[in-house]
Amino acid sequence: LNTEYFIAKKVIFSKGDKGTISSPIIKMAIAAIAIGMVMMLIAIATGTGLRQKIREKLVVFHGHIQIFAYDNNASEVSTHPISINQEFYPYFKQVPEVTHIQAVATKGGIIRTENTYESILAKGVGKDYNWQLLQDFITEGRTPNVSGEEISNEILLSTYLANRLHLKIGDHCHAIFLKDEDSQTPNQRSFKIVGLYNSGFQEFDASYVFTDIRQIQKMNKWQQDEVGNFELFINDFDRIEDVGYKVYGAVGSFLDAQTIIQKFPFIFEWVGMFDFNIYLIIGIMIIVGGFNMITAILVLILEKTPMIGVLKSLGMTDHSIRKIFLYNATYIIGLGLLWGNALGFLLLWLQQRYSLIKLDAATYYVSEVPIAISSIAIILLNIGVLLLCLLMLLVPTYVITKISPTETMKIK
């Protein structure tokens, strides 16, 4: 029989303690732990969710890694073609982390209607393009058919552009593309809108349209085996920098390789701040909860001073008595964690299910607060909070060693 645990249970569940001074203070400590846990869960779930969503959207439009000609200078517009006949295409055997590779080309232009116009970036894609990644963003219609023998005039437009241009599915839109030689007449194309997408990433929705890569090749007077660049997808985003170095070393001296982290450093620097904010919130909440627990335990020790004196007079060591109060603290913290997890998961579920909190897509790149829950992270958080709070209580429970059995008996 664990004597310390037995006595701790008696102290915790004693009916006579309901109206004592320590009772409301213990309830406040439980509430502080619970509120802190809710805040930490929300910080982790929303911070992780926002980071993942932004990563996913960048990958959909650009892949994890891009390979292009040095002369392009990482431009959004494909100016210098590269041959599709590469050792790494269509299977990048030199770098096994690469799961898919696709050839694309981009060209800047303008879509004009009778009343208005919008600048666009036409992204030409071919048979190897992975439409599945973009499928979640399709709001109406379908993706362009680019696998036929004839050059397709179908186009996928964003709902943002469609609304601004007053266009809908089935409409034909006229686009103008400048040629490389300024003196020549611009290329004009008529596209049929077969689908609309909405990624929530304002920067891309405001310009990106998807069409047949052969349209870009024809306008640029490229050969059928010439493309603008290659987009690579890998199996682990966390290893993107290492894989990027491998790809760079494997493509040869005439081509360059760039990860999306290198392409959009300002976005990833901003996203990196989420981790700092999460750690800051966790640290503050643990400190607040810990100090509330210290107050509760000190009050409980003072209230149970006569009991401590009796236990000491019966021969129980200071170490054993401290264990009794640490058992009590574990129960209080555990109760706070239980309520905190329950309330936190409820709030996260409501946000995930009903999208109650909206965001400005132009600022945050998403239209609503995304939620991502990692079971391992939540388990480690609960264990970490419990252990750190108990560690903080080792010092205040030291006052038990200063309590004299003789003096407590006199008080009693």
Where are these regions (language model features)?
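Mechanotransmission and gating elements of multispan inner-membrane complexes involved in transport
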Residues: 179-181, 185-278
